[in-house]
UniProtKB/Swiss-Prot annotation:
Organism expressing this protein natively: Zymomonas mobilis subsp. mobilis (strain ATCC 31821 / ZM4 / CP4)
InterPro entries from the UniProt entry: aa-tRNA-synt_IIb, aa-tRNA-synth_II, aa-tRNA-synth_II/BPL/LPL, Anticodon-bd, Anticodon-bd_dom_sf, Beta-grasp_dom_sf, TGS, TGS-like
Cofactor: how and how many bound: Binds 1 zinc ion per subunit.
Residues the record lists as binding Zn(2+): C354, H405, H532
Keywords attached to this entry: Aminoacyl-tRNA synthetase, ATP-binding, Cytoplasm, Ligase, Metal-binding, Nucleotide-binding, Protein biosynthesis, RNA-binding, tRNA-binding, Zinc
SMART domains: tRNA_SAD
Gene: thrS
EC number: 6.1.1.3
Protein name listed in UniProt: Threonine--tRNA ligase
Summary of the function given for this chain in its UniProt record: Catalyzes the attachment of threonine to tRNA(Thr) in a two-step reaction: L-threonine is first activated by ATP to form Thr-AMP and then transferred to the acceptor end of tRNA(Thr). Also edits incorrectly charged L-seryl-tRNA(Thr).
One Pfam family this sequence matches: TGS
Coiled coil: none
Amino acid sequence: MAEKIRITLIDNSEREVLQGTTTTQIAASISTSLAKKALAARFNGQMIDLSQPLLEDGRLEIITAENEAEALELVRHDYAHILAEAVQKLFPGTQITFGPVTDDGFYYDFAPKDRPFTEEDLPLIEAEMRKIIAQNNALVREVWERDKLISLWESQGEKFKAEWAKELPEGQELTIYRAGEWFDMCRGPHLPSTGKLDPKAFKLTRVSGAYWRGDQNNAMLSRIYGTGWLNAKQLKAHLERLEEAQKRDHRRLGQEMDLFHLQQEAQGSVFWHPNGYTIWLQLEAYLRRRMKNANYKEVKTPQLMDAALWEASGHWGKFRENMFVVPDEIPSTDPDKPVLSGKGNLMALKPMNCPAHIQIFKQGIRSYRELPLRMLEFGCCHRNEAHGALHGLMRVRQLTQDDAHIFCTAEQIVTETKDFVNLLDSIYRDLGFTSYAVKLSLRPELRAGDDELWDNAENGLRSALEQVGITDYEELPGEGAFYGPKLEFHLTDAIGRTWQCGTLQLDYVLPERLDASYVAEDGSRKRPVMLHRAIIGTFERFIGILIEHHAGRFPLWMAPVQAVVATIVSEADSFAESVVEKMKAAGLRVVSDIRNEKINYKIREHSLTKVPNILVVGKREAEEGKVAIRKLGSRDQIILSVDEAIALLLEEATPPDLK
């Protein structure tokens, strides 16, 4: 007879059940409605299927749609499997690879027999997926011996699945999930059946190419993306967000507003146009003022440095593949045969600024009286990102960071963290962001330092957060770097998307590797703690975020063109030009539009480029020395004298830190 086991439920109530009882049975014993709503379970911290037998004492949480994060993970996983099944039914001979869940959906990579998939195939595949959902096939977990599964894959011509399985240890048991006749290798868990999915809550969105295992030397596959939700209402809301995101796409607005461009000859590097660079300069000037007021010392360090420094810092071993490396060469008389200098040294463009900042710290003898030392650089770095990963301003190869490093003692960590978080919060609010989430990455399994060091570091960050009123942060066990815990700050933009921008990383290792020290109060030499910190991250990416957050409608202090003086008749041209000159002299960024075009055409054109203010002048305004101010997006206008208009615009155009 089966033994009894003790199951603790989420409300801490306990039940004794027979060993081998399933979550389905336990849910049914609680209530019929719970049994119907149940999707999966978490048992002793592990996600499991409802049908998986429980073999030991443990804590059980029954997952329903109310557990939205877990439920979405489950349904998207199932949609990916159903996508693969549908494709193989419609396109016989297609080989399957893998299909993970993404932030808002799923994708699956295929090796088609005849041709790559196109967007024209998607409606047909969607229809087949709905048929599979309607069949309500049970999703059954099976355990197979590795070698038998490999033989099966090979007999079916599934070379990619077979290749993957062959790399797993011999004798290892593998799990598959079967839905009717179709199955796929998968760890699970899955919903009880395909009928648990809402057939109106998913949509296939696009296709692309992808290399097998992400290696360009491997076969090119066809990737199909989809988005999946718990119900049709969620899908509709998501598609509306996507539509809004497309309207705000920084690449489209960047072109419409003449901010920047990218081109093939400089992949991953940005050509900033005058309008875009004006935004950059305003942002940089604002940050420079804020950092100066917070007692940061700005520095400038070389972009090209010897590989020996990167070896000493540890970046060479861990980051070399992402670095642009050049030999230290001396040109020869034969242009086809460059001659290496004596040692044939390798140089590398810096991917980050921290080793260079330590070199400045090491110049001369540092005293504890100088700490904390806050060192800032708007440092240009280069990272050799894969071509396929590049994306507008959001992922580039040449990037400029608002990078700073705080050298301090262990006792100063809490105070410095508090000051940093307060500064970050103030800057985000100035830039139009009122909401952000905080995550604390904790010690990984492999780490430098002992448990006491990590206890103090992690508790110090917790204490600092709580002292500034942040109590709902998320802890991420095992996600910290090997050299220290980290805080991450994730902004929420105007349409609800999150962007990880700010970081504060404790580092006990790099100062030791690069032999940084200071003279302590007792005369001994000690290592400083190094706090790597950023607020906006990189200028390129953050400006992309700003463009999309504001939909191109920048606050006046940051707008590249703050006003256009547009004429109705040619008799007002000279007056318009005099207004522009007077406003420029006052410090405003203003241009004139005296073209022989109708005023409505001019207004429409400048509205498309998101100019915040259009100052309309006709014959009457010119005679009276006035302008009619029309705000972007408004049909109303106010009539002011030129001096009144200048005063109004100057007040609105004052950066938030100078008000």
